[in-house]
Amino acid sequence: TKLDSLILDLRNNPGGLLNSSIDVANLFIDSDGIVVYTEGRVSKSDVSFPTEAGDILNGAPIIVLMNKGSASASEIVAGALQDHRRAIIMGQESFGKGSVQSMLSLEDGFGLKLTTARYYTPSGRSIQAKGIAPDIYLEDITLSSFEDAINLSSQEKDLKNHLLAESPSELSEEDILEMQDEITENRDKEYIELLREDYFVHEAINVLKALKVITNK
């Protein structure tokens, strides 16, 4: 089945192999350039990893979800797709694990791991300690925080001795207030159900729907 869009969820992805991140990014990039490059104090630390044109989605829109738990290889993927304008990054600024470490062998089976270089996105942004900034920021919203907000919220009708609205209908004041309460309760239930599912994914779907409308104009 042909995909018309994709949500790539990299939230809480701590990373993995460098080669794997390059392979993943290359699945969706159809332009010349690089996926990522490294720079260090010694010349042999300076390495570029080129793109291999071949977008398997043929330009279909991509949303990448990230949060503070997205690190290392997942940041390489997100940074490459963002710089090549191949995806919209949504969520939160990533962890910022952009250092290259080399292992030096010592005597008696010991080893020493040294940080020798940093990773940079195609446009030259350092990932280390900065992370990847999202194009669209999303705040973490928990079910408990939403319910607290509901309890704290108030409207005119919630105030003691509030002025009642005039109504030309035959409904009584009690009926009208009951209907208002039911509408509010149903709305709150919808939002709570959304949070139980996945707020980030829901917002990503909304963006993809908007992109589809724009591109079809």
Give the role of each language-model region.
Residues 1-217:
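C-terminal "post-core" interaction segments
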